[in-house]
Amino acid sequence: MAAKEVKFGEAARAKMLNGVNILANAVKVTLGPKGRNVVLDKSWGAPRMTKDGVSVAKEIELEDKFENMGAQMVREVSSKTADVAGDGTTTATVLAQAIIREGMKAVAAGMNPMDLKRGIDLAVEAVVVGLKGISREVANSQEIAQVGAISANSDKVVGDMIAEAMDKVGKEGVITVEEAKGLETTLDVVEGMQFDRGYLSPYFVTNADKMLVQMENPLILLVEKKISNLQQILQILEGAVQSSRPLMIIAEDVEGEALATLVVNKLRGGLKVCAVKAPGFGDRRKAMMEDIATLTGGVLVSEDVGVKLENVTMDMLGMAKSIVVTKEDTTIIDGAGDHEAIKARVNQIRAQIEETSSDYDREKLQERLAKLAGGVAVIKVGGATEVEVKERKDRVDDALHATRAAVEEGIVPGGGVALLRAREASLTNLQGANHDQQVGINIVTRALEEPLRIIASNAGAEGSVVVNRVVETKETNFGFNAATGVYEDLVASGVIDPAKVVRHALQAAASVAGLMITTEAMVAELPKDEPAMPGGDMGGMGGMGGMGGMM
């Protein structure tokens, strides 16, 4: 086991605070509408420009191990906030730095660290209640657009695009962000259920120009197993011909005689038909097939439930308004399933999302939920250079998370004002059990001003003057609009934050800050003195002695 170095008390805390300050000072230059960019060096490729706090925090690794411990603990604040709320990472870092800085001073002055921590926790609980009191639900898509624009660094185009995407796919819908090939940032919306399986044979194509299959008012046969024998589906084919409706077959596979017969019937024009493989794999495939059955009002032909393919009747087939199949994917539009059944299925998937501990499973369940409940929207982010595209994609991701958070828990006035208003409502009469706890409450009281101070100073204003002006005016929504330099009603001018983001930034900051204030010893591995690499001898070059005559 390697030898360790141990630091105690004030010496340990000073090193830790140093690391906190280095990381927080690099992150906080990005805060607010007039925050600056940070350039991140990469071991390969071009440097990356970002205004995303968590991206900056993740890049910082300090040489001194004790300072690095402090930096990494604050990095944890921003990455935890990013994981839960998706935005507010810079605010969380600024709050953590302020609480740690004031807390360390109090410990150095002889306060009891445990009482300080209790005071901090009391204050944070009270402020969270205060935030709930001033938050309100998102009223319309304009407010969604405003939240998105603020998070994307006052980029109105991004805010509008996210609001439009949410409008089209619903609040449960999946919105993904991808890098585009061109200059334009675009929004593609897939309404209905789409899965990534295309037609089994190009002979099924009905639109030869676009190489796709289009079916209006089709019947849909859903089969869990492979179909290889024609006799199994003959009865269904005859029923489809008699009803003069196209037939869509979704099965594990269709092969041999069955596939050949379907193709021949399609080419002769007697039967409009198309076959695709079932989406997904293993257990997930069965679940997705059941989703499709619920959406279309059909029955999944599965031996598990005692339904054999030979015994399928026409009323077991699903229906939809239309289906479009390309080489790569299939889209079912406006399935004819019962709304109550779809709702029950959606609630069942929601319950599974709550229960699962795997991020991968959660993501796949979210996709299934979106396909049933709304649709899928893709924002393709464009730009002139790769560096610009990556920077813009960071901002769009932030904006997307922020708008989701706003829909979940409502909105509060932005620009660092919500924390001050919640402070007025909840900390004015809050009393700790003793003097040291009261100091902990006062530390939080002071720290809640910090985001507004930094936003103001990044915009070229004097932080203390701005804070005093905002605190003097008791109107909840009144604050400093750093983008325009005007004091005004922030909600009316569209400067709003999701309550969830502000709440989580404060809770994560206080959680880590409380732990760091109560630290009394730090242990790190001693750096190893690696001997220098021995120089190689000039073996084999001895014969070059005669080169002396070249002088």
Swiss-Prot record:
Its EC number is 5.6.1.7. ATP binds at residues 30-33, 51, 87-91, 415, 481-483, 497. It is an enzyme of class 5 (isomerase). GO terms for cellular component: cytoplasm. It is found in: Cytoplasm. One of its GO terms (biological process) is protein refolding. Keywords: ATP-binding, Chaperone, Cytoplasm, Isomerase, Nucleotide-binding. PROSITE patterns: CHAPERONINS_CPN60. CDD domains: GroEL. InterPro entries: Chaperonin_Cpn60_CS (IPR018370), Cpn60/GroEL (IPR001844), Cpn60/GroEL/TCP-1 (IPR002423), GroEL-like_apical_dom_sf (IPR027409), GROEL-like_equatorial_sf (IPR027413), TCP-1-like_intermed_sf (IPR027410). It catalyses: ATP + H2O + a folded polypeptide = ADP + phosphate + an unfolded polypeptide. GO terms for molecular function: ATP binding; ATP-dependent protein folding chaperone; isomerase activity; unfolded protein binding. Pfam families: Cpn60_TCP1. HAMAP family: CH60. Forms a cylinder of 14 subunits composed of two heptameric rings stacked back-to-back. Interacts with the co-chaperonin GroES. Belongs to the chaperonin (HSP60) family. Together with its co-chaperonin GroES, plays an essential role in assisting protein folding. The GroEL-GroES system forms a nano-cage that allows encapsulation of the non-native substrate proteins and provides a physical environment optimized to promote and accelerate protein folding. This is Chaperonin GroEL.
